[in-house]
């Protein structure tokens, strides 16, 4: 598995967890509120763990790849703003 695929998989998992944070209905009873509160704590912990793994992968790359990635982002933003 290439590092690009790992990055995409981590980002996909991150987005799935973020989506779950906001998809659930608002709890009505005290029991539902307690359960929701626990689920939020769990999901936030999952997000922190995934953020750490994503950041570690980014930082593990060589400085050349990071500079090239930043340059690509700048070009993409410039072309997007011109459209």
Swiss-Prot record:
Keywords: Host cytoplasm, Host nucleus, mRNA transport, RNA-binding, Transport. One of its GO terms (biological process) is mRNA transport. One of its GO terms (cellular component) is host cell cytoplasm. It comes from the Viruses. Its main location: host cell. A motif (Nuclear export signal) lies at residues 65-76. It is found in: Host nucleus, Host nucleolus; Host cytoplasm. Gene3D superfamilies: 6.10.140.630. Residues 17-24 are annotated as: Homomultimerization. GO terms for molecular function: RNA binding. A motif (Nuclear localization signal and RNA-binding (RRE)) lies at residues 29-45. Escorts unspliced or incompletely spliced viral pre-mRNAs (late transcripts) out of the nucleus of infected cells. These pre-mRNAs carry a recognition sequence called Rev responsive element (RRE) located in the env gene, that is not present in fully spliced viral mRNAs (early transcripts). This function is essential since most viral proteins are translated from unspliced or partially spliced pre-mRNAs which cannot exit the nucleus by the pathway used by fully processed cellular mRNAs. Homomultimer; when bound to the RRE. Multimeric assembly is essential for activity. The RNA-binding motif binds to the RRE, a stem-and-loop structure present in incompletely spliced viral pre-mRNAs. This region also contains the NLS which mediates nuclear localization. These overlapping functions prevent Rev bound to RRE from undesirable return to the nucleus. When Rev binds the RRE, the NLS becomes masked while the NES remains accessible. This is Protein Rev. It comes from Simian immunodeficiency virus (isolate African mandrill).
């Amino acid at each position: 598995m290439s590092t690009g695929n790992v990055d995409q998989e981590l980002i996909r998992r991150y987005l799935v967890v973020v989506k779950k944070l906001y998809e659930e209905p608002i709890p009505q009873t005290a029991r539902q509120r307690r359960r929701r509160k626990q689920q939020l704590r769990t999901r936030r912990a999952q997000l922190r763990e995934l953020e750490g793994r994503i950041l570690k992968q980014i930082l593990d790359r060589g400085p050349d790849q990071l500079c090239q990635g930043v340059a690509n982002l700048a070009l993409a933003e410039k072309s997007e703003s011109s459209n």
